[in-house]
C-alpha cells in the first residue's frame, strides 16, 4: 500500500511511496509511478531512498541526482 510522502520541504515531485523488501514504488506529482529495485538502482541507493522516504525530505532530489533513469519498470 502506498503511503503519502510527507514532503517537508514543500516542493517535492514525490507524492506517495511504497517500501518493499528489495524495492520501492514511487508516485510522482504527474501521476507517473515507477518501481526502483536493488537490481536496477543498486542496493545502497534503495536503502538511502527508503530512509529519505520515511524522513519525508530529500527523496525527489536524491532520485533526480542519482537514480532518475535507473528504474526497473514504469507502472503508469
Language model segments and positions:
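A charge-rich, low-complexity, intrinsically flexible signal that marks solvent-exposed coils, linkers
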Residues: 2-76
Amino acid at each position: 500500500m502506498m503511503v503519502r510522502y510527507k514532503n517537508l520541504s514543500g516542493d517535492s515531485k514525490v507524492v506517495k511511496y511504497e517500501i518493499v523488501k528489495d524495492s520501492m514504488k514511487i508516485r510522482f506529482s504527474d501521476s507517473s509511478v515507477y518501481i526502483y529495485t536493488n537490481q536496477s538502482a543498486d542496493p545502497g541507493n534503495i536503502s538511502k531512498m527508503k530512509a529519505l522516504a520515511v524522513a519525508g525530505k530529500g527523496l525527489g532530489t536524491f532520485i533526480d541526482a542519482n537514480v532518475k533513469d535507473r528504474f526497473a519498470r514504469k507502472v503508469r
